[in-house]
Amino acid sequence: MPKRILTGTVTSDANEQTVTVSVERRFKHPVMQKTIRKSKKYRAHDPQNSFKTGDQVRIQECAPVSKSKRWEVIVG
């Protein structure tokens, strides 16, 4: 099964080798037909500490790195 790849914005880089990435998705409400934006935060592994708050990044699923990290940053 292929690994999922998501695109989002770095919202926090305060932790060592970890960034928090906010991923936004858009969909139409099934009844109202209005476009709705929802976002979810993922903690991703950043071994070189190269990404800063506000950067657009792509993250990919990986094996668990810690209790809360299941994603790794692949592209800036």
Swiss-Prot record:
Any one Gene Ontology molecular-function term assigned to this protein's record: rRNA binding
Record's signal peptide: none
Keyword annotations: Ribonucleoprotein, Ribosomal protein, RNA-binding, rRNA-binding
Region Disordered, residue ranges: 34-54
InterPro entries reported in the protein's UniProt record: NA-bd_OB-fold, Ribosomal_uS17, Ribosomal_uS17_bact/chlr
Matches recorded under Gene3D superfamilies: Nucleic acid-binding proteins
Regions that span the bilayer: none
Basic residues: compositionally biased ranges: 34-43
A single cellular component GO annotation: cytosolic small ribosomal subunit
HAMAP family to which the protein is assigned, alphabetical: Ribosomal_uS17_B
Quaternary data: Part of the 30S ribosomal subunit.
PANTHER family listed in its UniProt record: 40S RIBOSOMAL PROTEIN S11 FAMILY MEMBER, SMALL RIBOSOMAL SUBUNIT PROTEIN US17M
Protein purpose: One of the primary rRNA binding proteins, it binds specifically to the 5'-end of 16S ribosomal RNA.
Family: Belongs to the universal ribosomal protein uS17 family.
The protein's name in its UniProt record: Small ribosomal subunit protein uS17
Native species: Jannaschia sp. (strain CCS1)
